[in-house]
Every structure is written in C-alpha cells, then in structure tokens.
C-alpha cells in the first residue's frame, strides 16, 4: 500500500467513468466535474462501467500518479449516488481493493471465555 501523508482525503468519484481516460482526462474530470484540484495530494478513485476496474489518481511531490486494478472476476462495491464524490477512510480503501463490502464492515464474533 502507498504511504499517504496525514490529512490526505480519499474520494470515490460517483457514477461511471470512461476507463480509456488517463492522466489528463481523469485530471480534467476532477477539475471540471468535481471542482477540485488533481494536484491537491488527495486520492480520486474512478470505476468503469463494467465495475471490474478502478483507477486511482493522486499527486505526490514529483507529479501525478495513476494506479489501475482490474478484477479477474466480480465487481468493486460502489456507492449508489450518481454524481459527486464520496469520502472513504484508508481502511475502507483497503477493503475496496480487496473486493470486500467497505460500506458496512462486520466484525467477527468474539468467543466468550468463561472462568471455571
């Protein structure tokens, strides 16, 4: 996983994104659709129409970075909102990339120990 500075926000870009877009196209979408700055250091996560691919755009001290993950089967869990952006935590990002439902994580039930 990438080490992110404190204060870095992680944004899911709602809706469907054309996965043919790269640095310029995704950066333009961040600027004009989300009214945000792609060089802010925040992560912007886009999902394609089929739901099996996400792209993460972020800027570090040296320039723009683009990470792509495509699932061999299944889809990434995505918010139901159609436009705008949704903020998630680092833990939710890890769950998203592991194809887990990050929206309502469930804890495993702890075994109750009894003293005899």
Residue ranges and their predicted role:
Residues 1-116:
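Polybasic/polar functional segments that serve as interface/processing modules
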